[in-house]
């Protein structure tokens, strides 16, 4: 398969192919323009993969530009986080990082040009009055009483705005377009508003700040962007994008194209709702492993490759749809099944004593790090006469479908011996505290000599060598597929989205590092937590289970 055939195809790439073939463009230049007022989520990952991926595939350029036009909500913390997320996903921007604030002088000059052309005016309606005058989807708006001021008066008033002569909310600069337009975005939109706030890049140089719709089209043009890619909610805004560029003196006029945003089941993408989850402490922070943020997914154990693969699979279309969470989970499950080394850990432990094993002795058993990848090597795991097994792996009575340890029957310990359950001890409440077994000493990693069949295999950890570990069983944050449509989305938070267990792991887990996943055999995929784990306390996060339990529950 050629490189061109291996590329994903979609309507945007078809447009680019046509533009290059016709000579409209000789190169491709895209941009990713986040506002630094929060953490990026999986929806942003789709845009990152699209913009940077297109630039990569066409040997073009992709800018990282921060749309920093609202100093009240923005912070350098978010700038640093966004840069880190883009690089972690495997991309790098062309040249220096850009900021919309780099262009504040040019943007101001273009605003003055619109005033001089009679296409912008200073309005002194209150924000509430502006909303009232704007009209509705079924009723036209009405002109502001300040709409017909002279060019000279508007220039003087705009300068007064710039020099701090108005209080916040007392004046703004609006485009003069058409208050009867069927598109509300074209009903004399605000171009500049007053904000007395220190900016993280420009300090206190400005007290007027341009609006997004005025800023990003001009920024695209100044940077020579060839294809400006936005999500579908900006489709109507394209009219304003084109109007601004058509009415100022600028040599380049990029085109805006819209694609569907990513909607994912069992979570929310709204920045307001995500912020509420954090501020009301329903989650531990923006990087909580249950959050759809890139930092949360990373901490949970998702790999950059799995997120890129997910974005590739869902594709780019113009139709809004909701993607199943199972699709994202299958991407990380496939990645880790292929690449994660194996280890043994017992999440709900019960003691098992092998009564005929030499007392006080232990031995090392050899285990492959990956059953299908001998190149990943093997490890030595200690075995002794007292081990931990998972409580769910033993029953006093069971039917034939239960292939684990049953009283009076045999099971194999993974890569070790065949054992037989003989008796149990229980506490006053009737809970099993210890299982007593015997073992067949001639079955170390081989079948019994007499030919009897032992079908079940369970995992274990030597009690004398076990590492105490905290295991955080993360699950979907919400209990319904579309929490955003609930009357109160907080009421459908999954109460079992985090269950904390105290278990035991094999000694090799002492070398675990954050960001490197393991398959805990027969349990799922786990990684060391980057926040809570210490040298003295190992804390592992469940990234994803071995199979989709939600699909089974829904059947």
UniProtKB/Swiss-Prot annotation:
EC identifiers of the protein: 6.1.1.18
Gene Ontology CC entries for this record: cytosol
Gene3D superfamilies, A to Z: Glutamyl-trna Synthetase, Domain 2, Glutamyl-tRNA Synthetase, Domain 3, HUPs, Ribosomal Protein L25, Chain P
One GO BP: glutamyl-tRNA aminoacylation
UniProt-annotated binding residues for L-glutamine: 67, 212
Assembly mode: Monomer.
Name of this chain's protein: Glutamine--tRNA ligase
Organism: Salmonella choleraesuis (strain SC-B67)
């Amino acid at each position: 398969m050629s490189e061109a055939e291996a590329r994903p195809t979609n309507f945007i790439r078809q447009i680019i192919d046509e533009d290059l073939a016709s000579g409209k463009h000789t190169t491709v230049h895209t941009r990713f323009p986040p506002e630094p007022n929060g953490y990026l989520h999986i929806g942003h990952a789709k845009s990152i993969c699209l913009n940077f991926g297109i630039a990569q595939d066409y040997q073009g350029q992709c800018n990282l530009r921060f749309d920093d036009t609202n100093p009240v909500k923005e912070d350098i913390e978010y700038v640093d986080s966004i840069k880190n997320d883009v690089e972690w996903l495997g991309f790098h921007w062309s040249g220096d990082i850009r900021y919309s604030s780099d262009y504040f002088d040019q943007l101001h000059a273009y605003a003055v040009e619109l005033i001089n052309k009679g296409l912008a005016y200073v309005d002194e309606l209150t924000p509430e009055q502006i909303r009232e005058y704007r009209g509705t989807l079924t009723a036209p708006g009405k002109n502001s009483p300040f709409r017909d001021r002279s060019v000279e008066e508007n220039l003087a008033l705009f300068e007064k705005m710039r020099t701090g002569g108005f209080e916040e909310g007392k004046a703004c600069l609006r485009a003069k377009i058409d208050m009867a337009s069927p598109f509300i975005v074209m009903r004399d939109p605000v171009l500049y508003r007053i904000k007395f706030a220190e900016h993280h890049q420009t300090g206190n140089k400005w007290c007027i700040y341009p609006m997004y719709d005025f800023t990003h089209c001009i920024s695209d043009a100044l940077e020579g962007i060839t294809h400006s890619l936005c999500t579908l909610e900006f489709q109507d805004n394209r009219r304003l994008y084109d109007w601004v560029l058509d009415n100022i003196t600028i040599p380049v006029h990029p085109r805006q194209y819209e694609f569907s945003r990513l909607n994912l089941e069992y979570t929310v993408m709204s920045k307001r709702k995500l912020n509420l989850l954090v501020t009301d402490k329903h989650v531990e922070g923006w990087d909580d492993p249950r959050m759809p943020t890139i930092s949360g997914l990373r901490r949970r154990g998702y790999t950059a490759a799995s997120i890129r693969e997910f974005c590739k699979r869902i594709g780019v279309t113009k139709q809004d749809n909701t993607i199943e969470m199972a699709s994202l989970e299958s991407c990380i499950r496939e990645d880790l099944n292929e690449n994660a080394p194996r280890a043994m850990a017992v999440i709900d432990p019960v003691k098992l004593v092998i009564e005929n094993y030499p007392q006080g002795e232990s031995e090392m058993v050899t285990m492959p790090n990956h059953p299908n990848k001998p190149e990943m090597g093997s490890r030595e795991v200690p075995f002794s006469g007292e081990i931990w097994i998972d409580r769910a792996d033993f029953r006093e009575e069971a039917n034939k479908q239960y292939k684990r340890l049953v009283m009076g029957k045999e099971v194999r310990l993974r890569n070790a011996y065949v054992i037989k359950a003989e008796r149990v001890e229980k506490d006053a409440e009737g809970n099993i505290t210890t299982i007593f077994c015997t073992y067949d000493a001639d079955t170390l990693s081989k079948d019994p000599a007499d030919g009897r069949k032992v079908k079940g295999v369970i995992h274990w950890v030597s009690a004398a060598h076990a590492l105490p570990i905290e295991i955080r069983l993360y699950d979907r944050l919400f209990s319904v597929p579309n929490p955003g449509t609930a009357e109160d989305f907080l009421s459908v938070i999954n109460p079992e989205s985090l269950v904390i267990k105290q278990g035991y792991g094999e000694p090799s887990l002492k070398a675990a590092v954050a960001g490197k996943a393991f398959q805990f055999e027969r349990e799922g995929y786990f990684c060391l937590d980057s926040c809570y784990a210490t040298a003295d306390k190992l804390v592992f996060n469940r990234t994803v289970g071995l199979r989709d339990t939600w699909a089974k529950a829904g059947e």
